[in-house]
């Protein structure tokens, strides 16, 4: 009997082990044949996959492993051959982007084929007004990227940026700006970190030029070590990513240490790089002075139509320009400075296009054809004899145009020549530089857009862990998307990591910062949120230690903080509460019903006022009508305001003195005990 039980247990263990193994047996001939054909085509259909999969029940983890394995082989799983699109890159993302981390490993799927079919099933095409569903549907239409796809897009981003930088380096405006920035650095009005990208410059050429990638085993080991470290931290703190108050994924004390280290490292890098950068800027300034002389000479010759530079001068011009481009590229300028240079270039180009557009429209108004105008104008922007040459043209409209609009044409061309003088190069050269910068910027922007759209699933998988913390799900997604875009800008594919590994931190940081900054009805600065988190965590720890809530004095002693600061933080940490909050089990009353209204009249005071009004009316009615009216007008009883003797006298067509006498007589009557007794009780109360 014992032997039988032992055999059953062994069989059960064997089944469990089999269920955790891979779905595809790579030693099977049918599987080998299917994979070989799929690699050749780049995809495999669901029917072909189901034919080689086992029919027994499998776990969701096995399904995910199989999909990841096929993706790593470069095989895309599709519904059928008609659904295959040309050029689709069927990669898989990491665990964050691919599936729900909360799913249980032991949960059983109906079968391997059915589960895979369900995993690839598309969203229904029925209409919906739910913005979340609409967003998810649009997001799902974008294919995931393989590692090779990510690297290809990252290279396109880098190439576009290099093209843009190369264009900027050919513009004299860039060198003028660099000389100004050098002077600001010398004067101490600008920090080095505001001009160059410290981290990129500090890492040196080896970080950029290293073509080799880290081994997958090393990357996987680093990832597992980071996960173990995170689990240990959570177990030690007894909390999830964020405290109850809402804040960062790291404990505040660790964040403060990280920030201090970051600040120190930035200062250290700045101090170390400053001599090298200043030397480069000095070289740029000296070289540009030599180049500027040749540029001015070239522009003057074009304006005077006296020829061009000699061949020796042209060679020298090219050598100086190459030296400047090499020096500028070695600086790794800050992105904000690059944007400022591009904006300056585009602003001048906008003014140029406006002037050229005015000239073209003016010519077309005299019947000059557009193609004819462009043929005569392009390349002769700075030719001083252009007016004379177009006046001799026999084509329709040219003579009338040159004769009638002589003054206007000269004014417009003078503005164009001023732009050439401002840029230091010819108009055709300036236009070529602008097109080069625009091309690089456009290519980089398109590639960044593709990278962002392909990783929107990663934002969803991270954002869903931060729901019910004060922000709507769509707001969390959009904040995460902002972090994703920052990650795309800063991603360095040469380090060998997948983009999702790098982007996760940026996305989580953007989401947690937004929760800390926006989740509360009354905004609290992020640095104060971190202090609140620290106090809440310490308070929870002390509650376990001493068995009661700690006092502010105990918290101040434990945290080594001033008592007043602890009290202030505890006061700030209180959450607003709605006046409509139900009170009691029956929920027929609300919190607002129990709050005193300081401006409202008390019921007893209202009763006294009503009784006084009624008694005063009865007492005044015992006087003559004339006396009653005089008293009412003089003291404003039952009226909006009181009246002077003069105003009352005008009403009765008598003198002020007569009104005073009537008033005095009426007051004497009121002092009689029969009347005053009725009013005295109000005076006493």
UniProtKB/Swiss-Prot annotation:
UniProt short sequence motif Interaction with polymerase core subunit RpoC, positions renumbered to this chain: 475-478
Sigma-70 factor domain-3: annotated span: 530-606
Gene Ontology cellular-component terms listed: cytoplasm
Compositional bias (Acidic residues): 92-105, 251-262
Region (Sigma-70 factor domain-4): 619-672
Keyword terms, alphabetized: Cytoplasm, DNA-binding, Sigma factor, Transcription, Transcription regulation
MF annotations from Gene Ontology: DNA binding; sigma factor activity
Domain of life of the organism encoding this protein: Bacteria
UniProt region (Sigma-70 factor domain-2), positions on chain: 451-521
Alphabetized Pfam families for the sequence: Sigma70_ner (PF04546), Sigma70_r1_1 (PF03979), Sigma70_r1_2 (PF00140), Sigma70_r2 (PF04542), Sigma70_r3 (PF04539), Sigma70_r4 (PF04545)
Subunit structure: Interacts transiently with the RNA polymerase catalytic core.
Sequence similarity: Belongs to the sigma-70 factor family. RpoD/SigA subfamily.
Cited NCBIfam families: PRK05658.1, RpoD_Cterm, sigma70-ECF
PANTHER family: RNA POLYMERASE SIGMA FACTOR RPO, RNA POLYMERASE SIGMA FACTOR RPOD
Function: Sigma factors are initiation factors that promote the attachment of RNA polymerase to specific initiation sites and are then released. This sigma factor is the primary sigma factor during exponential growth. The sigma-70 promoter consensus for this organism is 5'-CTTGAC-N(16-23)-TATNNT-3'.
Designated name of the protein: RNA polymerase sigma factor RpoD
Organism encoding this protein: Rhizobium etli (strain ATCC 51251 / DSM 11541 / JCM 21823 / NBRC 15573 / CFN 42)
């Amino acid at each position: 009997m014992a032997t039988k039980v032992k055999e059953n247990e062994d069989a059960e263990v064997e089944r469990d082990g089999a269920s955790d193994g891979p779905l595809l047996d790579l030693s099977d001939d049918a599987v080998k044949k299917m994979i070989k054909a799929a690699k050749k085509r780049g995809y495999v259909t669901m029917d072909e996959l189901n034919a080689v999969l086992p029919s027994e029940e499998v776990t969701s983890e096995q399904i995910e492993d199989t999909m990841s394995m096929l993706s790593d082989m470069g095989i895309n799983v599709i519904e059928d051959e008609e659904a295959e699109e040309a050029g689709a890159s069927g990669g898989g993302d990491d665990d964050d982007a691919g599936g729900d981390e909360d799913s249980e490993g032991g949960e059983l799927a109906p079968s391997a084929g059915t589960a895979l079919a369900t995993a690839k099933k598309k969203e229904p095409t029925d209409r919906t007004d739910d913005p979340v569903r609409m967003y998810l549907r649009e997001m799902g239409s974008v294919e995931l990227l393989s590692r090779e796809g990510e690297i290809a897009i990252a290279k396109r981003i880098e190439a576009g940026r290099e093209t843009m930088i190369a264009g900027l380096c050919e513009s004299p405006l860039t060198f003028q700006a660099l000389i100004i920035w050098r002077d600001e650095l010398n004067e101490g009005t600008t920090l080095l970190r505001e001009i160059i990208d410290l981290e990129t410059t500090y890492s040196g050429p080896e970080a950029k030029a290293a073509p080799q990638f880290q081994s997958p085993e090393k990357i996987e080991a680093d990832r597992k070590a980071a996960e173990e470290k995170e689990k240990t931290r959570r177990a030690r703190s007894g909390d999830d990513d964020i405290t109850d108050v809402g804040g960062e994924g790291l404990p505040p004390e660790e964040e403060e240490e990280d920030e201090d280290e970051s600040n120190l490292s930035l200062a250290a890098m700045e101090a170390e790089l400053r001599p090298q950068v200043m030397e480069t800027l000095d070289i740029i300034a000296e070289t540009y002075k030599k180049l500027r002389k040749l540029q001015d000479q070239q522009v003057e010759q074009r304006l005077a139509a006296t020829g061009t530079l000699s061949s020796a001068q042209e060679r020298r011009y090219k050598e100086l320009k190459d030296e400047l481009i090499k020096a500028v590229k070695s600086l790794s300028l800050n992105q904000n400075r690059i944007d400022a240079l591009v904006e300056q270039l585009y602003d001048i180009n906008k003014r140029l296009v406006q002037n050229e557009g005015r000239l073209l429209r003016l010519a077309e108004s005299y019947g000059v054809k557009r193609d004819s105008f462009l043929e005569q104008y392009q390349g002769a922007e700075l030719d001083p004899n252009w007016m004379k040459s177009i006046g001799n043209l026999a084509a329709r409209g040219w003579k009338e145009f040159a004769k009638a609009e002589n003054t206007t044409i000269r004014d417009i061309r003078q503005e164009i020549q001023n732009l050439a003088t401002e840029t230091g190069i010819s108009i055709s050269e300036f236009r070529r530089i602008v097109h080069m910068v625009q091309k690089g910027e456009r290519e980089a922007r398109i590639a960044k857009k593709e990278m962002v759209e392909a990783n929107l699933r990663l934002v969803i998988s991270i954002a869903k862990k931060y729901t019910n913390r004060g922000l709507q799900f769509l707001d969390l997604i959009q904040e995460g998307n902002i972090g994703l875009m920052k990650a795309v800008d800063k991603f360095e594919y040469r380090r060998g990591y997948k983009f999702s590994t790098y982007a996760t931190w940026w996305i989580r940081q953007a989401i947690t910062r937004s929760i800390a900054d926006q989740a509360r009805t009354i905004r609290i600065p992020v640095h104060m949120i971190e202090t609140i988190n620290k106090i809440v965590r310490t308070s929870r720890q002390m509650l376990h230690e001493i068995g009661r809530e700690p006092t502010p004095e105990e918290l101040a002693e434990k945290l080594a903080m001033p008592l007043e600061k602890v009290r202030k933080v505890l006061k700030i940490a209180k959450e607003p509460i709605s006046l409509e909050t139900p009170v009691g089990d029956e929920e027929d009353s609300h919190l607002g019903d129990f709050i005193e209204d300081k401006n409202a009249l008390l019921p007893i005071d209202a009763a006294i006022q009503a009784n006084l009004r009624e008694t005063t009316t009865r007492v005044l009615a015992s006087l003559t009508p004339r006396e009653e009216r005089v008293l009412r007008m003089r003291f404003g009883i039952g009226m909006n305001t009181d009246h002077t003797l003069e105003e009352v006298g005008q009403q009765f067509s008598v003198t002020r003195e007569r009104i005073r006498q009537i008033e005095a007589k009426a007051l004497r009557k009121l002092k009689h005990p029969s009347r005053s007794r009725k009013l005295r009780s109000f005076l006493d109360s």
